[in-house]
A protein has these predicted regions:
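Dynamic helix-loop-helix/coil hinge segments at AAA+ ATPase domain boundaries and subdomain interfaces
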Residues: 1-7
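Phosphate-binding P-loop
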Residues: 14-21, 58
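Walker A/P-loop nucleotide-binding motif
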Residues: 21-37
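Post-Walker A helix-loop "phosphate-sensing" segment adjacent to the P-loop in P-loop NTPases
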Residues: 42-53, 60
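Conserved nucleotide-sensing/catalytic segment adjacent to the nucleotide-binding pocket
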Residues: 58-97
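Short regulatory helix/loop adjacent to the ATP-binding pocket of P-loop NTPases
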Residues: 101-116
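Conserved AAA+ ATPase "SRH/arginine-finger" region at the nucleotide-binding site
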Residues: 118-130
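C-terminal helical "lid" of AAA+/P-loop NTPase domains
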Residues: 152-156, 163-177
Length: 200
């Protein structure tokens, strides 16, 4: 789903394996779609998702995805080795985080220089067009077809994030089922305002 807030990031990811240094940082706030885009790249590149305790030698010659680098800090030495392996034939490294690499903490000077030189692509919070597409997708997954007034109401009221869109669709579906009502602007208002109790 392309929109002005993610088109540059999508193009940057699509440029793999031609990334400078065979590595890229995908940066954006929570709920901006980093995980969705990273997983799409992971599948397209047949990458390995890095987890603590993995044997680094098993990752040689493979593209590697490391998510939330700035929140669940990987060992400096492991990250440095992943950078080195990214340059090998068949390798590649995608790192996701909320903060840019220049703000990541490290005590290893060689890793600091790699982070400072890392190509970065940025995601913004979803705009109306992207959030609309996301809402449509989540409603479609539940076989729900709300009217235009529901979309317009939700776009004015919900937090600008993909998890928030998923959660409001879930809550509306549960409320409609519990109350034996169709999904309408009135139901959306009741759910968002908290005036409708889902469970007694």
């Amino acid at each position: 789903m392309l929109s002005p807030t993610n088109v540059d990031a999508v193009r940057a990811l699509d440029a793999w394996p031609e990334w400078p240094g065979h590595a890229l940082a995908l940066i954006g706030p929570e709920g901006s779609g980093k995980t969705h885009l990273a997983q799409a790249w992971d599948q397209a590149a047949d990458a390995v998702v890095f987890e603590r305790g993995m044997e680094l030698s098993a990752l040689e010659g493979r593209p590697v995805l490391v998510e939330d680098v700035d929140r669940r800090r990987a060992r400096d030495e492991a990250l440095f080795h992943l950078f080195n392996m990214a340059g090998l034939k068949g390798g590649g490294l995608l790192l996701t985080a909320r903060k840019p690499p220049v703000q990541w903490k490290t005590d290893l000077p060689d890793l600091r220089s790699r982070l400072n030189a890392l190509t970065v692509t940025q995601l913004g919070a979803p705009d109306d067009a992207l959030l609309r597409k996301v809402l449509e997708k989540f409603f479609r997954e539940r076989s729900i077809r709300p009217g235009e007034e529901v979309y317009q109401y939700l776009l004015r009221r919900i937090e600008r994030s993909i998890p928030a869109a998923r959660e409001v669709v879930r809550r509306l579906d549960e409320a409609a089922d519990e109350q034996q009502r169709g999904i309408s602007r009135v139901l959306a208002r009741e759910v968002l305002d908290g005036t409708l109790e889902l469970f007694e």
